[in-house]
């Protein structure tokens, strides 16, 4: 399943003075990620709800840990049920490593911060979270340097194995150096890392030539991507239940406008039209065990009352209201009972991992893919898209992100100014002053801003614009 080429690194040999023959190469990569500054910074980046609102809420770091665990579980499940289909076993820790780093390139303030930086960088190669992840791993982290500059840059990042880097490459596409506003958002990798991507692909493909319509995506990357979706659809919803932002009863009673928006978003990944009725059916199926249903022989609240014909309809309505009230009371348990929430989340994750299926690539097993069958895929997408539309797009959540767009834009403009380099740490300032052109300067500024946590970005902006800024003696 893995070759020496998969384990090859950009900088060889590594002169660290230690004989690590007893350590697995992918295990070394796992350790490098855990101890990296970029990995730690994820604790200061919001997942859905700002962590300052409650210690319970997930941040990018805890989300990544959950993705890593789910990815490892999927790999172990595939190894157990499909041990003869791949010509070897998948390395579970390699999949976990991909989970740890999958969000490491996200800027402050989530997708609004991403949009702000991409707009600022449209004439300089763009900005995209996955591309930034690759750049952090292969350039920005301060582990090793090349003996001679590669594509004008001697930084080698964490010098990870090629197969580890491949596990993070979700989009096999170079982002154009210059784009117009009408071109829209492009996912992929930056031109500055193209030479590294080409080397990684050559190592992993090991002579196999991709077909005309075939994209480069390894089995580990496929596992990480699905693990991310599972964590997103389950645990973000759990956070919403905890804070009382959503409840099962509210989801079951969603209006058609909300359900239509969810159906529209779910239709694209499902590659077909998803209907409102399907969404409602998913909710009924998921929540049927949570909301207590009265037994068939249970007493009705209206038992013993003689119902005249002229009030029969009103009585039925009253009983429906009482039934709904019971459902609502029961569903409130999700925000008040941690045992029930944990049971709910664990069961969903178990269903998804247990349902994963493999599509083996006979010619190049490294490019094998995993997927969920139709029913589970729909369940995942409905939960994911509903949380996105109902919670993440809610005014209370979007207000902070909207403000973040302006903060990131203001900071970028200030740093790109004639004296912007004076506002940055010494090491970044040195690279800015040595930049051969404005495009390289913009990328250095973008790297600095993208690495900020939410709090650091707000403090930095306050220093530039507010009378109530942090102390001037606090380090930049």
From Swiss-Prot:
The residues covered by the HD domain are: 60-233
Listed InterPro entries: dGTP_triP_hydro_central_sf, dGTPase, dGTPase-like, dNTPase_2, HD/PDEase_dom, HD_domain, PHydrolase_assoc_dom
Q: Where is this region: Disordered?
A: 1-20
Keywords from UniProt, A to Z, are: Hydrolase
GO process annotations (BP): dGTP catabolic process
Q: Which domain of life is it from?
A: Bacteria
Pfam families registered for this protein in UniProt: HD (PF01966), HD_assoc (PF13286)
Q: Which SUPFAM superfamilies match?
A: HD-domain/PDEase-like
Presence of the UniProt keyword Amino-acid biosynthesis in the record:
no
Q: Which family does it belong to?
A: Belongs to the dGTPase family. Type 2 subfamily.
What's this protein's name? Answer: Deoxyguanosinetriphosphate triphosphohydrolase-like protein 2
Protein's organism = Mesorhizobium japonicum (strain LMG 29417 / CECT 9101 / MAFF 303099)
